[in-house]
């Protein structure tokens, strides 16, 4: 049985950037058709993400941002991850992978599953982090990984771990973002994987006065709707975890619009999103101040 501790960040009001909200709106627009893997809408989403990567001056591996892969469902299917990186200045050979899945459920008949919270919000936060880190010379190198086919079984992150652009031994941490735009049924944002970093938890507790710690345990999950019971396998950090790479996962609780056509950008909660972005950025700032031994020493 896997046992994992997570912390809960309750609502704190901060301002949210216009670009963050605009990226969510664009990615969850009707033109994207729900971003189902293999669809024309997913291709539009990739084009949007690639253009944002380019506008931020992010470098690519092997001359392009796309990482294609095959996976088996009812039949063999193809997916496409979007990769970019920012070279670090102090530890350039040590990488932090920031991940967020861009795929969603597509459409059924006339009903579009827009996927604003799940997971345009996470991709927008990834882009926000990329923008902030592009303004400085970060200590670590950062890979920005927008994954495909997460909804079908974490296939994008599995493909990345199976065929990484850098050696897995050089990846010190995965920071995964999934559903951070709404408070959900419990009004909370969850952070899991942080039990490895008690100093980080102490700082977050000081910054967010209503932070709590909750134990989460359960058998390995096969169905994503069980995410609240098995945090180590809840999203794209799962394959990193299984590869022995430490992870931090920010994600919200399910809400009434989860996996429905009502998950629209108009229902994103700016105050909650701003709080989540503040917590994520605080975490990155803490990571930037740690030597590799602190992160490397947490490998399983």
Q: Where are the regions that the model predicts?
A:
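N-terminal signal peptide c-region/cleavage motif recognized by signal peptidases
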Residues: 13-15
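Extracytoplasmic/secreted proteins, especially bacterial periplasmic and envelope-associated proteins
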Residues: 19-26, 40-55, 64, 121-128, ...
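Acidic/His- and Gly-rich active-site-bordering loop/insert found
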Residues: 27, 53, 70-109
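Second-shell loop/turn segments in exported
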Residues: 30-40, 70-72, 110-119, 146-147, ...
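A non-catalytic alpha/beta surface segment that caps or lines the substrate-entry region
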Residues: 35-86
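Alpha-helical metal-binding/catalytic segments enriched in His/Glu/Asp
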Residues: 84, 98-152, 280
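His/Asp/Glu-rich mid-to-C-terminal helical/loop segments that flank catalytic regions of hydrolases
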Residues: 131, 255-300
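Metal-dependent peptidase/peptidase-like ectodomains
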Residues: 137, 147-249, 295
């Amino acid at each position: 049985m896997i046992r994992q501790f997570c912390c809960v960040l309750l609502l704190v009001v901060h301002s949210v950037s216009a670009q963050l909200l605009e990226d969510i709106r664009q990615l969850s627009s009707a033109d994207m058709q729900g971003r189902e893997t293999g669809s024309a809408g997913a291709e539009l989403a990739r084009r949007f993400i690639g253009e944002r990567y380019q506008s931020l001056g992010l470098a690519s591996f092997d001359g392009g941002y796309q990482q294609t892969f095959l996976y088996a469902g009812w039949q063999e299917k193809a997916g496409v991850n979007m990769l970019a990186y920012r070279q670090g200045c102090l530890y350039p050979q040590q990488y932090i992978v920031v991940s967020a899945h861009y795929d969603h459920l597509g459409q059924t008949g006339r009903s579009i599953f827009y996927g604003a919270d799940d997971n345009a919000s996470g991709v927008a936060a990834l882009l926000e982090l990329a923008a902030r880190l592009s303004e400085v010379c970060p200590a670590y190198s950062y890979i920005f990984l927008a994954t495909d086919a997460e909804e079908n079984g974490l296939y994008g992150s599995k493909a990345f771990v199976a065929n990484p652009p850098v050696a897995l031994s050089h990846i010190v941490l995965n920071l995964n973002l999934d559903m951070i735009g709404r408070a959900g049924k419990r009004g909370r944002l969850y952070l899991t994987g942080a039990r490895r970093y008690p100093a980080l938890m102490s700082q977050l507790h000081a910054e967010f006065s209503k932070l709590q710690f909750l134990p989460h345990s359960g058998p390995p999950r096969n169905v994503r709707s069980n995410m609240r019971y098995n945090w180590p396998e809840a999203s794209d950090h799962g394959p990193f975890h299984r590869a022995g790479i430490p992870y931090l996962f920010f994600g919200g609780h399910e809400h009434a619009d989860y996996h429905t056509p009502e998950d629209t950008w108009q229902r994103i909660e700016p105050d909650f999103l701003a709080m989540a972005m503040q917590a994520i950025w605080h975490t990155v700032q803490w990571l930037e101040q740690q030597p590799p031994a602190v992160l490397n020493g947490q490998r399983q």
